[in-house]
Amino acid sequence: MHSDPGPWHPLLCFLVLALSTSANSDVTPRFTSKPLSTVQKPGGPVTLLCSAEPPWAHISWLFNGEQFERISSQGVDIQSGHLVIPSLGPAHVGQYQCIASTSVGAILSKSVSVSVAYLNDFETTTGHSVTAEEGSSAFIGCKIPESNPKAHVRYKVRGKWLKESSDKYLILPSGNLHILNVSVEDRGTYRCAAYNPVTHDLKLSTSTLKLSVNRSPRVDSRILHPVTSQAVLVQIHDPLTLECVVGGGPSHPPVYWYKGGQEAAAYGRRKLLHTHLVIEQVQRSDAGNYSCVLGNGSGISQRVYYTVIVLEPPSVSQKTEDQSLTAGSNVRFSCESRGNPTPNITWFHNAVQIHASTRHQISGNKIRITSLFAQDSGIYQCFVNNEAGSAQVSQRATVHLKWSKPVIVSPPTSIRVANGDLVTLTCNATGIPTPTIRWYDSHGPISSHPSQVLRSKSRKALLSKIGTPGQDPVHYTMSQAGSSSLYIRAITVQHAGTYKCEATNEFGSAHADAYLTVVPYEMSTKPEDITPLDLTQSDEGDYDSETRVPDHSQINEHKPEPRVTEKPYSGASLPEAPIILSPPQTTKPDMYNLMWRSGKDGGLPINAYFVRYRKLDDDGNMVGNWNSIRVPASENEFPLTELEPSSLYEVLMVARNAAGEGQPAMLTFRTSKERTSSSKNTQAPFPPIGVPKQTIIHGVSNTNNGLVPVDPSRHSGVPEAPDRPTISTASETSVYVTWIPRANGGSPITSFKVEYKRTGGHWNAAAENIPPSKLSVEVSNLEPGGLYKFRVIAINNYGESRRSTVSRPYQVAGYSIRLPNPLIVGPRIDQTEAVTDTQILLKWTYIPENNNNTPIQGFYIYYRPTDSDNDSDYKRDMVEGTKLRHLISHLQPETSYDIKMQCFNERGASDYSNVMMCETKARRSPGASEYPVLDLSTPSVPDRSSSPSHSPTRNGDFLYVIVGCVLGGMVLILLAFIAMCLLKNRQQTLMQKFEPPGYLYQGADLNGQIIEYTTLPGTSRINGSVHTGFMGNGNINNGCPHLHHKVHNRASEVGNGELYPGCNSSLKETYVDYDRLPHHLSNGRVMYTALPQADPTECINCRNCCNNNRCFTKPNGSYCGNGVAVMPVGFSPQQEEGETKPLNHVMVPMCLTSPDQNCSEEIEEDQNEKETQLSANSVCPEEATQTGTEQHEGEDCTKTEDDSSILTWTPLILPAISKDCDEKHVWTSTDITLDKSNVDHPQLQTQEA
């Protein structure tokens, strides 16, 4: 039985993992796989592989020495670990290099070439014949066309293809054919062909060769091939054949090969193949001059020479070491290499070529860098290359700005803890180079190993060992560069004292002290005495705030806790782990109800439970810090709140009695997704199982009421299945299997077991009886190229747990055949939403890393009605690319569907995803409004947000429609208002245009006749100007309905008098009085009166124009000479109802006399009227206006005019009149034609617009 690792074992494992990861972050990158040169046919795919260690190294590519980011990379797909050219073209041909970068620096791989395969045509030749003697050798020559890669030569011999050499026919490396022991059957035609193994092109020579066989007498032997000396280039370790074809008689003299005057075939690696010299593996010593000698009895008859040049790829012989340098110093690097021909040397710094400069001095195979800066830190590479290949060696250099002694920036703090608690002291220091930190106590340096504290000790055992010499150490250290933490578990009074942190580097040291105070245990167990005992350490070494639940039973009863000395520990032990009853998934996204029942108390009552929980990622790695909660012993459930939706959490729970803390119970659970109103059907969460708050009685059955039951192993005492194991490479034939344990079922885990199986095989045990302190094991002796899966089993006193989830398939290196289906893990469906009665919106997440970043071409979406059990009912939609949403259409209304997915590429499809159910909406009634369907296309870059929208999309669109309609209506109203204002302004402008301040009556002869009109009190203007009227030189007929604007409150009277006696014609003042005439208010605020219409025949010589109540005459009209008395117009005394105001009397003078009249009249003011202002439009400024209005009496009308529908209005332009009326004046006018529709109205009323 293995000793128990204790409740802090998971924490220790995570600390070791975190520290090892941090320590490896400063690792020099190195390539684990490098790209290889490739020849491909035009349009074919090309894949260049490149991987490096550490795994987080960044991979980039160079093309012909330029970064792909700086040049056009069209048609090239760069992904993690490989570069893919889907269709090879001329633009892709060139040299490629791979760069691996980390925080330390960057390294550059050797240059590889990507070229296009081709095969040229044979040169055009004419056919010829070859004659050979029977029994001798024949030589058939073939000039192979240029090809990439080198073409394979074939021969068509008498209608049959010869692809490889045989006993009789030798196809030489040069492509020529050597026929041995020629016979008559060998006669016929021969034709050579070239075959390209990449493009699979086969091209025939343009001519054929005819072989003739002679049975002639013996002839002299001769060398048929070659006929001239040859130079041959061969790479070291390649095979070489030096050709020498001898023809002649059936038997020829022997053939000898010499090298440097010595027989060449005497050497073991050099052999004769008929008359050819074959060297199996060329070495450097095989270079030199060779000769093929044909001899006869009389001496040497013929020979041919070969010069062999052995090409040797460069190699670097020296070993390099990392260098630590100081800023401002100098450094020298050398590169010892060899090769044939002599290699060229190129230096690179962090994958950038170094050119000679004042600071970089390059001489031969050495480089010297002076006055180093911090930027000179990194990786230096020496590249050597020649015609045979290339090689490189790298060396890391670190440049420190300045050296400095250590400085402790975060010293340990003195603390006061309870007996038996866990203590953490932390110390951080800086310095150049980074200092090393060690701890000291009163006994000296502390150097315990973590493995010594993996055994759990009870508090009783620890207390009983106080003062006992040779006790096991209970403290250990975890250190990395510049930082260290000292952990002391189950502290006792003996550990109290001073602890010193010492930081040391090459230039000095520094130290800081902290004092540790240990208080008795009974002081810490009282509810009112809270100490750091209940705090738990986070993975970063900091303490988190804790949440406490008051123990009401202890507070109310005030029962004192028993002291350690009050009760003997005989027969008592630590409590067993609580039995957690909660399901592994909660129905709420932000809360988990933790429920449990107590295990055996160990003979002492349980004082409290301690719950610690933290967040994990989907791979089981820690994300958040530990949160600690103290729960009273009387409780058996507690809600964990403020959790994140769709997240994985780990819970560690222990019970404490007077003897100490017992074994921990572990659990992992996942919170549910955050519900949204837009998703009607989501994946059903794992239902909870109701557990009463009272302690559960053993042996009582509990029904699930149709709910999914919890894993029965959780109540049987066996541990929970560990998490899915992760696999990492250990060597070419071994792997590391790592896992995370879960709840122990109430009994400590005693061991683990790892099983494995190969694809298509059975499960076998890889390792058994693994101590609980080990969470990783190496599995070796795996077959190269095999595909394996692994699983883990936890074991305690109750038995074995269920098998863990099977690991992802792992392929051992060395397997050359491509996998039939590299896509293993499919996408995960996140959300389904019924958009309409026939459409469902599907959203999913795909993680390329789950399939080793294997490229995919798209997704398959399968759906069928939920009530169907036939897989053939599934329909499939295909989504190309890397979209993460799709709209499934043409569905049945109000029908539930099962939906699942796969990802695929050209080699197959992945496993199925999770299955989701979603029901379409009910069918809409006819005429119901339908919201527009949104564009559901998304970019290729995935959005992995786990929180869906909280409001339906269509409501937002409807709101936009309403807002748009309101804004549109407001704009239309504003435009209408602007149009009305513009129209009103135009009318007023036209009004002012045709109503000048002074209205001029037109006629052939106009005298200075005065037309008098009345305005409201205080005003004498119409439309802002004094209005003046002019009458013609004639009489007004009795019935002429003209307005003369004489309205005042005086009594009616008729009077005539001469106003201007100096003129030939006198102007008479005339008044016309009518009772109760209608009055109108013009827009110039002038009260006027309209006269009743008389017989139109009496107005034949006068025309009315309804324009501000003034009467105009036609320009060609004349007035009568008879004087007509006009009654003054006034208000009747019976004018009641409204209040009437007196109207002002306004007189407008005008002097329009004949030329012989003197116009120097004076204007007297009426004594009974108020003085009024002279009109600004008076032609004679010297004249004044008299009270009243005179009407000129003229002769009878002698001229009539017909009633026309067109009225011509000619405004006068009057020149200034001099004081003497002797000179002639000319008036000009402009005709304006108006419609006369209003003139013929039966009752004339003048109205202003």
From Swiss-Prot:
Disulfide bonds join C50-C98, C142-C192, C244-C292, C335-C382, C427-C501. Pfam families: fn3, I-set, Ig_3. Residues 1159-1168 have a biased composition (Acidic residues). Residues 29-113, 120-212, 217-307, 314-400, 406-517 form the Ig-like C2-type domain. GO terms for biological process: cell-cell adhesion; nervous system development. Residues 937-952 have a biased composition (Low complexity). It is found in: Cell membrane. Residues 1-25 form the signal peptide. Its main location: membrane. Residues 26-957 are extracellular. Residues 577-675, 721-815, 826-923 form the Fibronectin type-III domain. Glycans are attached at N181, N289, N296, N344, N428, N870. Residues 979-1249 are cytoplasmic. InterPro entries: FN3_dom, FN3_sf, Ig-like_dom, Ig-like_dom_sf, Ig-like_fold, Ig_I-set, Ig_sub, Ig_sub2. Residues 545-566, 1190-1202 have a biased composition (Basic and acidic residues). One of its GO terms (cellular component) is plasma membrane. Keywords: Cell adhesion, Cell membrane, Disulfide bond, Glycoprotein, Immunoglobulin domain, Membrane, Repeat, Signal, Transmembrane, Transmembrane helix. The chain crosses the membrane at residues 958-978. Residues 1173-1189 have a biased composition (Polar residues). Residues 528-585, 671-690, 929-952, 1158-1202 are annotated as: Disordered. It comes from the Eukaryota. It is a single-pass membrane protein. Component of a cell-surface receptor complex that mediates cell-cell interactions between muscle precursor cells. Promotes differentiation of myogenic cells. PANTHER family: CELL ADHESION MOLECULE-RELATED_DOWN-REGULATED BY ONCOGENES (PTHR44170:SF1), PROTEIN SIDEKICK (PTHR44170). This is Cell adhesion molecule-related/down-regulated by oncogenes. It comes from Xenopus laevis (African clawed frog). The lineage of its organism: Eukaryota, Metazoa, Chordata, Craniata, Vertebrata. The gene is cdon.
